[in-house]
UniProtKB/Swiss-Prot annotation:
Keyword Signal found: no
Cited PROSITE patterns: PCI
Native source organism of the sequence: Drosophila willistoni (Fruit fly)
UniProt similarity note: Belongs to the eIF-3 subunit L family.
GO CC aspect terms: eukaryotic 43S preinitiation complex; eukaryotic 48S preinitiation complex; eukaryotic translation initiation factor 3 complex
Assembly behavior: Component of the eukaryotic translation initiation factor 3 (eIF-3) complex. The eIF-3 complex interacts with pix.
Transmembrane segment boundaries: none
Span of domain PCI: 306-514
Alphabetical keyword list: Cytoplasm, Initiation factor, Protein biosynthesis
Main location: cytoplasm
Name of the protein described by the UniProt record: Eukaryotic translation initiation factor 3 subunit L
Lineage of producing organism: Eukaryota, Metazoa, Ecdysozoa, Arthropoda, Hexapoda
UniProt GO BP: formation of cytoplasmic translation initiation complex
Amino acid sequence: MYGGDEFSNNGDFYDDYAHTGDPQLDLEYERSYYTSRMPDNVKYFLMNFCQAIKDGNLYDIQNMYENTFPQISDHHFDKTAWPEEQEVASIVDNEKVFLILYKELYFRHIHARIPGGPKLDQRINSFFNYCDFFNLIISAQNPVMLELPDIWLWELVDEFVYQFQNFAQYRARLTDKSQDEIQQLCVNHSNVWSILCILNVLHSLVDISNIKKQLEVISQGVDPQTVAGDFGKLSFYKMLGYFSLVGLLRVHSLLGDYYQAIKVLEPIEIHKKSAYSHIPACQISTSYYVGFAYMMMRRYADAIRTFSDILLYVQRTKQLYSTRSYQNDQINKQAEQMYHLLAICLVLHPQCIDESIQQVLREKNYHDAMFKMQCGDLDVFKSFFIFACPRFVSPCPPAADAPMEDYVKDPMEHQLLVFMDEVRQQKDLPTTRSYLKLYTTLPLAKLASFIDPNASEDDVSKLLIRLLCFKHKMRNLVWSKGPSGLEGSFKSGSELDFYIDDDMIHIADTKVSHRYGDFFVRKILKFNDLNRKLKGVNI
């Protein structure tokens, strides 16, 4: 009746002709067809995952999200995608909310694991899936009764911003795209992953949760439930609002708007531990972007404090990040980036830091690079910055008629230009500082001869400009208290200060001695704690 070739292609013939016209029978057929292709443990996992989300069982959801899903991904889908939506829909009774959440994980897995990254249609579909999720929870008249673990909410917001960043870089690379793809990007889907959409979603989550008001009253010792509203009372909305503030910090940093990046965090007291900072990846990411923004605003003292505090935290909790996972890899990479940024800041603005951080800088040979930077090696500054900075993006995509070039590096090169311009202004200051540290009084002419043995009177007047530059660059705005990270007072951060009377420089060493007592107290307490644990061990 049928030719033999009609039965080829692994039985796809039956998929074309086995429909009866009865919706119920067709649904049962599709369910049996897809589930027969799916490994049993994957099928049971999806069914149990869906049921746990429907029941709001946070313990089971978190266990399956953090443990089972990565394990199955490693075993069955290491370099391939998870089953598509229609395959999963047939075994979870088309549960709408679960399918949206499943697709979020599905597209996240493709971004992280599939060689070559996602295709254009997958990037677009991922965007529309996020739109479905956010429309579901933001546009509802009443709060959506959905319970998800905080770690998932953080990674959802973090991934949302990451995919925006990734898409912005993808669309800026015109050299590897056909005319049809450029048409799709610039005309048919010009609003997909647009900066306005991203900012609108994040601000909407902040507003609907009333998270800013809640943080303000918490700092005043008032119960946040009094201002939370119907949506903000729920942990689901409250945590999404908080994580969206961090998402906005990241977005503005990627765009190079450092003032707005710090401004958006104003309800959060950046330098104080918060009840909302229990997700390590969120806390570390916040400190990375805050510290980087401070550095680019030339607030080196605040940047050093931010990096030092979080790197001490990473040191104390490093056992948590030893297992291999996407978030742990990201945490370890950001920690390494922050050591590079800290080294830059310490060269530009020397000051005392915790001894354990100094020890890490010594062990990882940062001191060699720091010495080169102090000697004015601009290439080391450049390489450290390129390694440690965020991957900047442009808010505006290339025009449809733009030359077929690679525009990905343009935002990075602009930020590098701004940074290196500041470094060039300061590259001679370490030399000046090294001479001043040797004296309590020093004639201007003598200092000029140290710097240039053939110095003339014109060089002495130029030296005054250099000394004024030293004073200016060593004077920073430093945060002291208050909810706004932009507030502060001007302080001199140099280890020495000086004034000029006629042609004589009067120098005062203001270096603060190392507080070794704190270091030894911490080590003694740690040793006592270890001793107590050893005594409690039964042999």
